[in-house]
Amino acid sequence: GPRGVGKTTSARIFARAINGFEVADEAMAFNVFGLDAASNNKVEDIRSIVEQVRIPPQKGQYKVYIIDEVHMLSQAAFNAFLKTLEEPPPHAVFILATTEKHKILPTILSRCQIFDFHRISVPDAVAHLQNIASQEGVTAEEEALHVIAQKADGALRDALSMFDQLVAFAGKKLTYKAVTEQLHVLDHDTYFTLTDQALASDIPGAMLLFNEVMSRGFDAHHFITGWASHLRNLMVAKDPQTLQLLEVTEDVQSKFQDQSS
């Protein structure tokens, strides 16, 4: 699955579950091994794991080996790993996490049970951020959380990192204005204004708005791309059947409906 959607976190929860939650955390630390294949992709790195696999766990039933970014392993490392995957000891469980499944050898894939993770939708990310804000005593405007979720582009880990940074910067009250300024993103009103100017053939007004946006340090390409997304949202808002595709708050959704009509 894509980055930041909980693959490694799910792997650690799974490792905890199959060993039973009654096992102490200190004991579990010896049963779970992590390897970042992006920086440990040589044959020697895999062989060190293969040697450890033979030793049964002291407490709990399983030893769990979590290999992140497994597609980064070299061909020789994959080959060294293959025999162990074919005939693993009964106490060993391997969890392979990757963002690029197509790069993994078919001989490896055929020996695995595959779970596909998907990008986190904006409403789900917003709901999770609202829950965290409530637990941490942070007051956050819904539209501000929508901006964070959209900026994260389906990666909840990125959304949480941005949320932490914004709370450190803006304090316990997150406003839409503070979030857009800190994340350096244009608000919806800019695109609504530009579209109104275009529909009214107000070329001077549009040029002045564009100049203002450039003077604030925004990239012209991103500005045009953002406007293209805005126009796409207007087409989506014209039909009640496609309205659910708009990943915005109800207030902004109403603005899209008004402008599209």
Predicted features, each with a name:
Residues G1-I114, D124, I132:
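P-loop/Walker A NTP-binding region and its immediately flanking N-terminal helices
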Residues A11-R16, D45-S48, Q113-S261:
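Extended, largely alpha-helical regulatory/partner-binding modules appended to the mid-to-C-terminal parts
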